[in-house]
Amino acid sequence: MQTDILASAPRTTDGQMLDQNGGTIARSRVKAVYIVPDTGAGSVVFRDGGASGAVKVTLNTLAGATASDYIEFPGEGLLFQTNVYADVTTVASVMIFYG
């Protein structure tokens, strides 16, 4: 099934991922993630349904603010039933591509 791919607004702190206009991203499939790391090693934990929601994936980053990471998920991507919450640690920014 073909779906349009959208890009979220970049997120620099813990919180719900938002679309480019600041709106909520509800049920969706995350197809890819773009992470700009900070100077130290860090991580991004994606949860379904807020700060205490189920962990869908944890992505660890290497130290180095000049080496961004682009990660594509196989198949149809990761399904988030409620919303997409990102818990960022030592990461400059994170952005998702979803549909």
Residue ranges and their predicted role:
Residues 68-76:
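Exposed aromatic-hydrophobic patches
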Residues 31-33, 76-90:
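Noncatalytic modules at the cell exterior or secretory-pathway interfaces
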